[in-house]
Amino acid sequence: DEIALSAGGTEALYALIANYAPLRAGDAVIYADVDYDEMQFACDYLAQSRGAQLVRFDLPEPQTKANILAAYDKILRDTPRAKLLLLTHLSNRNGLVPPVKAIVAMAKARGVDVILDSAQAVGHIPFTVADTGADFIGFSLHKWLAAPLGTGGIYIARDRLKDINPWLGNRIHDADDIRARIPTGTVDFAARLTVPAAIAMQDALDLEANHRHLLRLRDYWVERVRDVPGLEIMLPDEPGSYGAVSAFRLPGMTGPDDAKKAAKLFLDKYRLLVVAKAGLASGPVLRVTPALFNSSAELDRLVAAVIAERGLFA
């Protein structure tokens, strides 16, 4: 009774953010540059529709745990009317895994609720709800858990259910039923019926072992390019602060057009999929996301391509 399935992580988080009940005029909603675009849009909508203040801040680089904690502490201290904080469990921009439990505790100590975006974390990082301390979590099931597209879910702590309003006045389910917080239209029930099998597969594979392997893949390519002159790796090698996802910036790469050009080059010339990601305060990056099936030989191709193209914008 604390979890309901949704049509994906985005729908789940829209349901939590847009229907967050305690926000009043004059309160503040906070999010950071590493947060997912659509969840930022949802916070914008929530603040505008309630007459609340919207506070966006940029996380400092290098994004060490100490720097991240200091940044969240400062923004919470500087925003005395803060009521809601959006926190991303694993950033889809650069792969940052912040110290979630510490930030949630910091926010709660100031009376600030946290909506945790775990879309990239479920099936990727081993964790439990208790590990986060969060009362509200939205997540995807098609990314790292490998369930079909159209699967995700929300978690709402039992004693906080009334703080998320039913979806557009939904009365298909009772107000004390978490399912009232999710749209009730026709869904792909076949996709949802596969979720138990996807979970069973991940359990059989051993999530802890998967995570260790993904970290090895990430470290493999990063270690081989970190000292390339002018190349920026967007996260430090601090244990617990990243997963498989990481990002880099070629020397001289500045605007979004540069990032798109580089991503196209890597795909067309080297058959390597890197993703141009904008949104970070420091500028666009190229995201690399190895999966369990990737080999060291494939990562060697990535390393060679990065070294060969280091002068693309220099």
Which sequence ranges carry the predicted segments?
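Active-site phosphate-binding strand-loop segment of PLP-dependent enzymes
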Residues: 53-55, 64-119, 123
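PLP-dependent enzyme catalytic core of the Aspartate aminotransferase-like
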Residues: 255-258, 264-274, 278-314
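Active-site PLP attachment segment
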Residues: 132-172
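Conserved PLP-binding catalytic core of the aspartate aminotransferase-like
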Residues: 215-219, 225-269
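Conserved PLP-dependent catalytic core of the aminotransferase class-I/II
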Residues: 190, 195-236
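Conserved PLP-anchoring active-site segment centered on the Schiff-base-forming lysine
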Residues: 2, 6-7, 20-40, 53, ...
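A short glycine-threonine-serine/GTX helix/turn-capping micro-motif
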Residues: 176-189
